């Protein structure tokens, strides 16, 4: 956990939650999936998990948990697909023809590493709808918001877990208004420090 003034593409945040190990380490990814699956295993039929922001490892474990042999699990014994859209030259999310069939007519769970403003989630939701998928829910490691367009976001961590956490759209950023310079640029890959700052700790 780092505290400071972080700028993402869509928002400014007071903290950066480093979930790198959770996205890339076997044990932590499996644990994350074990928490998230509880929201869906007995209630939602899931055919495909659409992974955003490098969440494919967690998504793979999540698919395995959803499909485990459990007489009460909705997806028991099913083959759950894991796919990731790509950005075309215009910045639009697309699925290539060989992957589109895993979304079209399927019950889809959207998995995102972190949700702050919800804009990335909305773009992914629009992509899923365009390709004919039926969105069954949104799962995230961290989410600053409870819903995206009335779709609940089920997350492991929320702002309540981070004392003093603030997120805002760029024009409304209280840190900018207070004259605090940006410490780092952040995205789904990590963050890049712009200057040394004692507040980042």
Feature names for model-found ranges:
Residues 47, 106, 136:
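Conserved acidic residues
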Residues 44-54:
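Short glycine-rich phosphate-binding loop at a beta-alpha junction
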Residues 1-45, 188-201:
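Active-site-facing substrate-recognition patch
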Residues 38, 64, 68, 126, ...:
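Short, well-ordered alpha-helices that flank and scaffold nucleotide-derived cofactor binding pockets
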Residues 56-109, 116-120:
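Short, glycine/charge-rich flexible loops or terminal/linker lids adjacent to PRPP-binding catalytic cores
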Residues 51, 110-111:
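Hydrophobic Val/Ile/Leu positions in short beta-strands of Rossmann-like dinucleotide-binding domains
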Residues 125-201:
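PRPP-dependent phosphoribosyltransferase catalytic core
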Residues 44, 73-77, 132-134:
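Short helix-terminating capping/connector loops at secondary-structure junctions
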């Amino acid at each position: 956990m780092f505290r400071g003034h972080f700028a993402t593409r869509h928002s400014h945040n007071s903290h950066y939650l480093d979930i790198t190990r959770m996205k890339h380490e076997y044990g932590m990814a499996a644990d994350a999936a074990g928490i998230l699956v509880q929201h869906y295993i007995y209630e939602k039929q899931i055919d495909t998990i659409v992974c955003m922001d490098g969440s494919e490892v967690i998504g793979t474990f999540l698919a395995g948990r959803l499909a485990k042999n459990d007489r009460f699990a909705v997806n028991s014994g099913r083959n759950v697909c894991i796919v990731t859209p790509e950005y075309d030259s215009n910045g639009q999310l697309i699925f290539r023809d060989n992957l589109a069939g895993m979304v079209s007519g399927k019950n889809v769970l959207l998995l995102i590493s972190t949700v702050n403003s919800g804009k990335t989630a909305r773009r992914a939701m629009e992509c899923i709808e365009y390709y004919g998928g039926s969105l069954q829910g949104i799962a995230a490691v961290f989410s600053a918001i409870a819903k995206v367009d009335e779709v609940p976001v089920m997350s492991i961590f929320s702002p309540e877990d981070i004392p003093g956490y603030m997120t805002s759209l760029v024009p409304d950023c209280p840190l900018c208004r207070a004259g605090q310079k940006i410490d780092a640029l952040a995205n789904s890959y990590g963050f890049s420090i712009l200057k040394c700052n004692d507040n980042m700790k």
